[in-house]
């Protein structure tokens, strides 16, 4: 057998094996988070629920609205398979149906201000950012079958419900938990040195 052909054959089988492994991992609910809203790493879909609660960490598709389209065009979020043409996001549920949200200088839920959640009106390139409002109001009650999400990991820089609004629960893929975080791998490598 020609040595060049043999190398191509091995490479082909390696590609098939890599694709098969990736597909198997994906269908079993494992997802790679590369954003900075939550620590980069591997997460797994833990549970799909009928009702989500505050503090649930969820994987979801953001709403298909102008705020999300603008964020995609500006490169805040990546293109993907959601109806909004974005990749799914990982965020924490901060408010659920019936909770009162106020978006003024910061995010407040039921009159309790969330730490470090300053609402920005310009991005780093001085382009306008418009906070979400429901029917023109910056104080609203989370509608039925929707949740309000944010990131406590990076609260001041997160593109979340303060800009794109509540997320319909049918956009939620499920709760997630971390399996392997990049910081954990780095700490392990540092410990070996």
Predicted regions and their residues:
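Soluble "head" domains of membrane/secretory-pathway proteins
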Residues: 4-7, 27-193
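Hydrophobic membrane-insertion alpha-helices, especially the h-region
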Residues: 8-26
């Amino acid at each position: 057998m020609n040595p060049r052909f043999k190398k191509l054959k091995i490479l082909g089988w390696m590609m098939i094996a890599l694709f098969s492994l990736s597909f198997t991992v994906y269908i079993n609910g494992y997802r790679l988070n590369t954003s900075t809203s939550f620590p980069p790493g591997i997460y797994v879909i833990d549970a799909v629920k009928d009702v989500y609660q505050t503090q649930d960490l969820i994987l979801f598709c953001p709403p298909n609205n102008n705020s999300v389209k603008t964020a995609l065009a500006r490169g805040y979020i990546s293109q993907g398979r959601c109806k909004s043409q974005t990749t799914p996001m990982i965020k924490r549920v901060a408010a659920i149906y019936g909770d009162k949200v106020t978006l003024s200088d910061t995010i407040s839920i039921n009159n309790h201000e969330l730490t470090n959640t300053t609402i920005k009106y310009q991005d780093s390139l001085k382009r306008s950012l418009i906070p979400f409002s429901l029917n023109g109001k910056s104080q609203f009650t989370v509608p039925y079958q929707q949740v309000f999400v944010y990131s406590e990991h990076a609260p001041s820089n997160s593109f979340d419900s303060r800009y794109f609004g509540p997320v319909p629960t049918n956009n939620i893929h499920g709760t997630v938990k971390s399996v392997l975080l990049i910081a954990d791998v780095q700490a392990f490598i540092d410990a070996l040195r």
